[in-house]
């Protein structure tokens, strides 16, 4: 899991901006996240996978953070 500091940076980023580069805790996935209508969608940069989250907490718990 990411540090509390990085998790807080991720939360703060999306309070100010609707779009951001993302990295996964495994180090194997990178993507771009867009926040619309309070939901978070991450498009994987390596393939066509898309990950959707209802909350920021769910996104963080799944191992994603701002890059």
How should each PLM-predicted stretch be described?
Residues 1-67:
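Terminus-proximal functional modules
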């Amino acid at each position: 899991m990411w540090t509390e500091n990085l998790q807080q940076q991720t939360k703060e980023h999306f309070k100010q901006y609707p779009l951001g580069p993302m990295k996964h805790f495994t180090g194997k996935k990178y993507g771009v996240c867009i926040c619309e209508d309070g939901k978070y969608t991450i498009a994987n940069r390596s393939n066509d996978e898309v990950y959707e989250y209802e909350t920021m907490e769910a996104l963080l718990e799944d191992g994603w953070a701002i890059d």
